[in-house]
Amino acid sequence: MGPRNQTAVSEFLLMKVTEDPELKLIPFSLFLSMYLVTILGNLLILLAVISDSHLHTPMYFLLFNLSFTDICLTTTTVPKILVNIQAQNQSITYTGCLTQICLVLVFAGLESCFLAVMAYDRYVAICHPLRYTVLMNVHFWGLLILLSMFMSTMDALVQSLMVLQLSFCKNVEIPLFFCEVVQVIKLACSDTLINNILIYFASSVFGAIPLSGIIFSYSQIVTSVLRMPSARGKYKAFSTCGCHLSVFSLFYGTAFGVYISSAVAESSRITAVASVMYTVVPQMMNPFIYSLRNKEMKKALRKLIGRLFPF
């Protein structure tokens, strides 16, 4: 596309959540409720892990990091959506859009890595219980956390810097409720080959590789559990993994839903809704999954609530 069709972009336009201003209270209330539930739920998980010494283990330390990441990922997208709904203004500045792209990549990448590390933790606990304290020592799982942070941050910075090199056309309407790197790249007039290569590479590193690791870990766990002689041992092992398996299924299920909707949906609004659900629903449901299905977490939460509201 020729230079005459390019322009210096100062802002992008996001998709309207609703076309009717009189109905804006409905989506605003929905997003606000989901956001508050996500923040409060994950904040309770953070406080429970900090306050209860029985939860100072690798598994709950990883859950602590996952809950913190959930708060950050949701906060990256939902507040801007709420502002746009209330103001009936769909614009987002160029700098704001790049910042949102970078933060979404950081926290989505972290979430994927943490889920893989948690699967490995369950694999070691069930398949190698006698060596658990040796294999999952504080230095090793601390290193895994730092490595996850480094990889996701570097990926986000590289992809954001490559977006900075792009020239954009006059059409700067993003068919989503927030800035997402793939959709922003589609608006560029300049060559996007390197950007697309980076996206495919990142999808492998933060999608296919963690997913393969999780599937391998659970295949080994299932094999090990089936060899257990007692039904009680099998139940305990499966219940230990149940929470993580539910969270993993929800996260990758919504991610797969985004991919399918973008590939087959005729309406861009369907893809937009699927994308925002990916950054909200798993993060909102994680605290409920862990608080309802994990006995130790339920006990810690009851103690915490008793301290916060002693009446």
Swiss-Prot record:
Q: Does Cell membrane appear among the keywords?
A: yes
Q: Establish whether keyword Disulfide bond is in the entry.
A: yes
Q: Which residues are glycosylated?
A: N5, N89
User: Could you list which ranges are Extracellular topological domains?
Assistant: 1-29, 79-97, 155-196, 266-269
Please give the CDD domains that the UniProt record associates with this protein: 7tmA_OR7-like
Gene giving rise to this polypeptide: OR7G1
Naturally occurring in which organism (per UniProt): Homo sapiens
| Disulfide cross-links | C97-C179
Q: Which GO terms describe its cellular component?
A: plasma membrane
Q: Provide this UniProt record's keywords sorted from A to Z.
A: Cell membrane, Disulfide bond, G-protein coupled receptor, Glycoprotein, Membrane, Olfaction, Receptor, Sensory transduction, Transducer, Transmembrane, Transmembrane helix
Topology relative to the lipid bilayer, per the entry, is: Multi-pass membrane protein
Family affiliation:
Belongs to the G-protein coupled receptor 1 family.
The family database entries (PANTHER family) matched by this protein are listed as: OLFACTORY RECEPTOR
InterPro entries named in the record = GPCR_Rhodpsn (IPR000276), GPCR_Rhodpsn_7TM (IPR017452), Olfact_rcpt (IPR000725)
Q: Which Pfam families match?
A: 7tm_4
Q: Which GO terms describe its molecular function?
A: G protein-coupled receptor activity; olfactory receptor activity
Name of the molecule in the record: Olfactory receptor 7G1
